[in-house]
Amino acid sequence: MKALVWLASALTATVLLAGCGGSKDSATTTPTGPVASILKVAPDQLVYRNTTTLTITGQNLLKGLTINNYGCFTMTEVGTGTDTQRVYSCKMITVGTSLLKVYASDNSLIYSGTLTVPVPALPPQVTMTTTLGSVVMQLEPSKAPISVDNFLNYVESNFYPNTIFHRVISNFVIQGGGYTAALTQPTTQSAIVLESGNGLKNVRGSVAMARLTAPNTATSQFFINVVDNASLDATNAGVDGYAVFGAVVSGLNVVDLIKAVPTSTQGGMTDVPVTPVTITGMTRSQ
């Protein structure tokens, strides 16, 4: 999309675990002899945004494993594994049931199962306080787990206070979370993969990740659609479009106040509010 320059975040769904060390890099050579086989994969707990430990038991496990689970982020081996047992920990970033597959070093599927994370009784909500009022956003971890976890990481690290809405287009979007009033950019976390095409649409009041032209480039910046923007929806999931991860459930009138502020060109950027609209607080309220 040419009308905006987007910024934004990247998680990896597949973790390669080479033999004898839990490396996340794939092995350059294929081990000889028998490949691994699995008897059991046992998680200790499955709680949204908590760490879970997976204990894998079987045979020849040091020959190399590839574990694939979309909702299990930052897979790390715990301790020193053996040929009959390896233990890994990861952060569960999705809710509901996700598929878990394990492949041997020859790429054969040696285990297929599921991990089910109970849906929280109350969906996550974030309250954003600005110089023009407060906005409550409800997030959708079942539809956009990577984007939601990324956004909450920024919220919990107190990243957003003193950033501004730096792009305001009254018949399009309000975009913020990436610049200070001096139009400097705070240091962000790593970029995330694009979760467009997740079933959530860029309609009025929806909240989505901003990004650069390339798909997997979102970091901290987000935007709120002030009108229905079907042109921002994906035609090729994960390749184009913009990933919606939540919606405004309270304070849409404040969004309308923000979209109406006068703007100008500043620091080489267009559509910057003449008087900064500053995010003064961002906290998880549910």
Predicted regions: what is each one?
Residues 1-8:
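Bacterial N-terminal signal peptides that target proteins for export
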Residues 13-14, 83:
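Residue-level signal for mature regions of secreted extracellular proteins and peptides
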Residues 16-19:
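C-terminal motif of bacterial Sec signal peptides marking the signal peptidase cleavage site
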Residues 21-286:
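Cyclophilin-like peptidyl-prolyl cis-trans isomerases
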